[in-house]
Design a protein with these regions (language model features):
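Mid-domain alpha/beta scaffold segments of enzyme catalytic cores
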Residues: 1-278
Length: 278
């Protein structure tokens, strides 16, 4: 069984064919997917998707948060709404944390001060509710590490990690797993491949970030966009980089995700279709 710890099933690219996208993932034995919200307004849509497709993907879960790319238009009222949404979601076993949150210092037209304000406010919520976080860390690893050290956050996932080995070690020390996916399928991705090969295996989780971060074969095979059904193929590439068999790798990254997201682990432990791994 495979796990995708970061997939935007609510993206517009999937809207006209979501049922077939989910079915394809199920056929490829993807049994758990994490769907992170990117805006406070997404709360109901991600919750409904996680519930609607739970028979097909029994480990389908969601997180709530405001992505840094949407911080320019975020108001104080959105943060208040997010707190209300998190409070209400605590009774839902498919709600597993706060995310996608973080900082993005690559996109030039984002106000860094606004980003930082929204990010710190969401870290405060994660600390208040003692929930793990799903982090967006593009060119912002050091700033995020500094913020995390000031808070008592119960770990989480640094999604699409592409930092240094030293930064990776610091995230791990703070209780985080590191997400890797399609970027590692490119031969030129030497730093990412080194991280996958040399980091402790217990620190790694798998993700697609679908429909984004296309794997290397996407264009050559005339595929429109990334999707969760590609998780096994991507993960097999990661296992090959690591030098271990895919069965061992699949089992290990599943346990890693469950370890860092205990509400996800509890959901899977209650499901007879998933209990043998969780």
């Amino acid at each position: 069984m495979w796990i995708d710890t970061h997939c935007h099933l609510d993206a517009p690219e999937f809207s006209s064919s979501l049922a077939s996208i989910i079915s394809a993932a199920k056929d490829k034995n993807v049994r758990a997917i994490l769907l992170p919200a990117v805006k406070a307004a997404d709360s109901e849509s991600v919750r409904m998707l996680a519930s609607q497709y739970s028979n097909e993907i029994p480990g389908l879960v969601y997180t709530l948060g405001i992505h840094p790319l949407y911080t320019n238009q975020t108001q104080e009222s959105d943060l208040n709404l997010l707190e209300e949404q998190i409070t209400g979601a605590l009774v839902d076993p498919r709600f597993v944390g706060v995310g996608e949150i973080g900082l993005d210092y690559f996109v030039e037209d984002l106000d860094p001060h606004q980003q930082e304000y929204i990010f710190h406010a969401q870290l405060e919520l994660a600390e208040q509710f003692q929930l793990p976080v799903i982090l967006h860390v593009r060119r912002s690893q050091d700033a995020i590490l500094k913020a995390l050290r000031r808070r008592n956050i119960p770990g989480g996932i640094a999604h699409a990690f592409n930092g240094s080995f030293q930064q990776a070690e610091q995230f791990i020390e703070l209780g985080f797993k590191l997400g890797f996916g399609g970027a590692a399928t490119y031969e030129r991705a030497l730093q990412i491949r080194r991280l996958i090969k040399e980091l402790p295996l217990e620190s790694i989780v798998t993700e697609t970030d679908a429909p984004d971060i296309p794997p290397a074969w996407l264009r050559s095979e005339n595929l429109a966009f990334n999707e969760p059904a590609f998780m096994p193929r991507i993960a097999r590439g990661l296992a090959a980089i690591r030098g271990i068999n895919e069965s061992e790798f699949a089992s290990r990254v599943w346990r890693n995700a469950m370890q860092v997201l205990p509400r996800w682990s509890a959901l899977c432990a209650d499901n007879p279709n998933l209990i043998q791994i969780s």
